Design a protein with these regions (language model features):
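Structured beta-strand-rich core segments of catalytic domains in phosphoester-bond hydrolases
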Residues: 29-116, 226-227
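His/acidic metal-ligating clusters that form di-metal
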Residues: 101-112, 126-153, 165
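N-terminal, active-site-proximal structural segment of metallo-dependent hydrolase catalytic domains
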Residues: 1-46, 62, 107, 249-254
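Acidic/histidine-rich helix-loop elements
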Residues: 2-16, 84-86, 115-129
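Active-site environment of divalent metal-dependent phosphoester hydrolases
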Residues: 7-10, 37-41, 60-61, 117-120, ...
Length: 254
């Protein structure tokens, strides 16, 4: 599962829904964007059988982290890579995991949150920042994962060129892999604690779009994919919808 947790926005109202989501349907693997220390603590509480990266680099608590079910995976190594994302401590975050069951192949699990189109630099020069960031992600994962099975999860903040870059880099999203198109992942509506119609840059509301993705590459097969509709006591956990997918890792002898 990949999930943008919407930073600190209305977090107090959303905490019960975040907790309920992960308690009701805990994923084996979870990638997050717009993470904060408080929401990280909520996820930790809701996923007691999972481990995540513990590291002094601030981005693991203020941008993204990666969780895995401990009975299924062992951590081999982890790291970050600067891929040009214009936000403090934003990186490509990744882990290499070894499945415990049978002789399944190792897996690189990674995430990033590409720069928002409303960033001051992009508004000033009118140049798409995410295309180059996607190119750097592909280059980084070429080096990190090589020919290994690789999952890349992302809030891509775009509907065009960055997606094409990933596809031409050998990645296939979990819906295309099944001959489908993704449902909308942002924005979630209704949100009872949000009354504004527009955004801080425009009176227009944010259009419905799919910007949250799970991509795969290498020896790993997509079996199912879903954009999750979830509310708890009338509240959504975020202004994004989580995306969940099921994969099969072949054995090392296959």
């Amino acid at each position: 599962m990949t999930y943008n947790l919407w930073g600190d926005a209305h977090l107090e109202q959303r905490e019960p829904a975040i907790r309920d989501l992960f308690s009701i349907r805990p994923p084996d693997l979870l990638a997050t964007q717009e993470l904060r220390p408080r929401s990280r603590a909520v996820v930790d509480e809701a996923l007691p059988g999972h481990a995540r990266v513990h590291d002094d680099f601030p981005g693991w608590g203020t941008q993204s982290n990666l969780w895995w079910r401990q009975e299924l995976f062992d951590l081999v190594e982890y790291g970050t890579r600067d891929v040009g994302i214009l936000d403090t401590d934003a990186r490509l975050f990744w882990v290499r995991l070894r499945p415990r069951a049978g002789d399944a192949r190792p897996l690189v699990f990674s995430t990033a949150h590409l720069t928002w189109p409303g960033h001051a630099q992009e508004r000033a020069d009118r140049r798409n920042l995410r295309t180059g960031q996607a190119e750097q992600v592909v280059t980084a994962l070429d080096e990190i994962a090589g020919d290994e099975a690789c999952l890349f999860t992302v809030d891509i903040n775009d509907i065009g060129q960055p997606l094409w870059v990933l596809g031409n880099g050998g990645f296939l999203d979990s819906f295309s892999a099944l001959g489908r198109t993704s449902p909308v992942t942002h924005p979630v509506a209704p949100l009872p604690f949000v009354t504004d119609r527009g955004t801080r840059l425009s009176p227009l509301g944010s259009p419905s779009k799919a910007i949250d993705w799970i991509f795969s590459r290498g020896p790993i097969a997509t079996r199912a994919s879903e954009v999750v509709e979830f509310f708890s006591a009338g509240n959504a956990p975020s202004d994004h919808k989580p995306v969940a997918a099921t994969f099969t890792l072949p054995s090392t002898t296959a």
